[in-house]
């Protein structure tokens, strides 16, 4: 199925560009909106996004644009790849233009002052729109370089899921569907925090046992927190949970992993984020997640430990000592431990 109208991708970053390329390769006409006219002109003239995805050719079917009002008017299916800190500011003035649109969030973040996920913000801005999210183990550069990849589109709107699958599904990109939008989106946001910790552990040359422990305990923490908020724990055993967690905590291509690695090399948080040159959602998510988990009294020792290192002046050695002294609880929280 080929969309009769062009499809919009909002955001000029690496992931937005990778998704725009996939759509164009599948025969779709794509309008990729970005705020910076110089960036748009660079992509238009060089067919490359030199700032965020250097070395990857941008498909001729991707048209970089800077007129947001016209882009929203022309397109029915709209992928939103804006930073979490900018999403509301960019789209709020155009809420009438979003009525009855299909809005699919690609952003894995949480709004700091409200603890709202991106799809919840989209619902606030455009209550008459149809909302979905995409999440999974999806490193932008690997998608752009046609590594075999799978993702999840999640929405209670089955037709929206089907349209996204038809638009994106291709020879190297497989799209599964889920109705647990909240769980899928929450998994994508939470794992960024643990990727920072994984990068820090790698820079400190910690062993494979340690890294495995961190990833599996991170999964337990994520699931414990998400279930308290009403998500389906089974979602965290799929691509948007353990799948995304593994790739983000294992790959130097992950932005949040890079921030953690830079911290382990001795850089300050400000220096680490500055060196990255892109948005690392995990830093902001850590702040709001620590506050929310304390408020809800959810046991999240890894979150508390990383927060202590980044924002409370604790050293890694001090935090490790506290973590290893903690009382060990059950390994898996969501099955009975009696009768086995």
Curated annotation (Swiss-Prot):
Q: Which Gene3D superfamilies match?
A: N-(1-d-carboxylethyl)-l-norvaline Dehydrogenase, domain 2, NAD(P)-binding Rossmann-like Domain
GO (cellular component) term, any one: cytosol
* GO BP terms in the entry: carbohydrate metabolic process; glycerol-3-phosphate biosynthetic process; glycerol-3-phosphate catabolic process; glycerophospholipid biosynthetic process
**What does the record give as EC number?**
1.1.1.94
Highest classification ranks of the organism = Bacteria, Pseudomonadati, Pseudomonadota, Gammaproteobacteria, Pseudomonadales
Q: In which pathway does it act?
A: Membrane lipid metabolism; glycerophospholipid metabolism
Keywords carried by this UniProt record: Cytoplasm, Lipid biosynthesis, Lipid metabolism, NAD, NADP, Nucleotide-binding, Oxidoreductase, Phospholipid biosynthesis, Phospholipid metabolism
The EC category is: oxidoreductase
What residues form the catalytic site here? 191
Q: What does this protein do?
A: Catalyzes the reduction of the glycolytic intermediate dihydroxyacetone phosphate (DHAP) to sn-glycerol 3-phosphate (G3P), the key precursor for phospholipid synthesis.
* Annotated family: Belongs to the NAD-dependent glycerol-3-phosphate dehydrogenase family.
Which reaction is catalysed here?
A: sn-glycerol 3-phosphate + NAD(+) = dihydroxyacetone phosphate + NADH + H(+); sn-glycerol 3-phosphate + NADP(+) = dihydroxyacetone phosphate + NADPH + H(+)
Q: Which organism is it from?
A: Pseudomonas paraeruginosa (strain DSM 24068 / PA7)
Q: What is this protein called?
A: Glycerol-3-phosphate dehydrogenase [NAD(P)+]
Which parts of the sequence bind NADPH?
Answer: 14-15, 35, 108, 140, 255, 281
InterPro entries (UniProt xref): 6-PGluconate_DH-like_C_sf, 6PGD_dom2, G3P_DH_NAD-dep, G3P_DH_NAD-dep_C, G3P_DH_NAD-dep_N, NAD(P)-bd_dom_sf
Positions with a binding annotation for sn-glycerol 3-phosphate: 108, 136, 191, 244, 254-256
Q: Where in the cell is it found?
A: Cytoplasm
């Amino acid at each position: 199925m080929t969309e009769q109208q062009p499809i919009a991708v909002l955001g000029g970053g690496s992931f937005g560009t990778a998704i725009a390329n996939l759509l164009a390769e599948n025969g779709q006409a794509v309008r990729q909106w970005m705020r910076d006219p110089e960036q748009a002109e660079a992509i238009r003239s060089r067919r490359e996004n030199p700032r965020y995805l250097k070395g990857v050719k941008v498909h001729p079917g991707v048209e970089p644009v800077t007129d947001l009002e016209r882009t929203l008017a022309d397109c029915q299916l709209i992928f939103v790849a804006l930073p979490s800190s900018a999403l509301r500011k960019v789209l709020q003035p155009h809420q009438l233009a979003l009525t009855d649109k299909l809005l699919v969030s690609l952003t894995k973040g949480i709004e700091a002052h409200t603890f709202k996920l991106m799809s919840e913000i989209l619902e606030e801005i455009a209550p008459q729109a149809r909302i979905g999210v995409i999440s999974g183990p999806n490193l932008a550069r690997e998608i752009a370089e046609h590594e075999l990849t799978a993702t999840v589109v999640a929405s209670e709107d089955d037709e929206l899921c089907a349209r996204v699958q038809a638009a994106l599904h291709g020879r190297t990109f497989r799209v599964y569907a889920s109705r647990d939008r909240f769980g899928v989106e929450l998994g994508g946001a939470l794992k960024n925090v643990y990727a920072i910790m994984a990068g820090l552990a790698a820079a400190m040359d910690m062993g494979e046992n340690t890294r495995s422990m961190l990833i599996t305990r991170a999964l337990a923490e994520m699931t414990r927190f998400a279930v308290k908020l009403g998500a389906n724990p089974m979602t965290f055993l799929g691509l948007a949970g353990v799948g995304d967690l593994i790739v983000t905590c294992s790959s130097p291509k992950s932005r949040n992993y890079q921030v953690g690695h830079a911290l382990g090399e001795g850089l300050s948080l400000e220096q680490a984020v500055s060196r990255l040159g892109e948005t690392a959602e995990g830093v902001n998510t850590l702040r709001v997640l620590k506050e929310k988990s304390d408020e809800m009294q959810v046991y999240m020792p890894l979150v508390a430990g990383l927060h202590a290192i980044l924002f409370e002046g604790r050293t890694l050695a001090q935090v490790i000592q506290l973590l290893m002294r903690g009382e060990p609880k059950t390994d898996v929280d969501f099955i009975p431990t009696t009768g086995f």
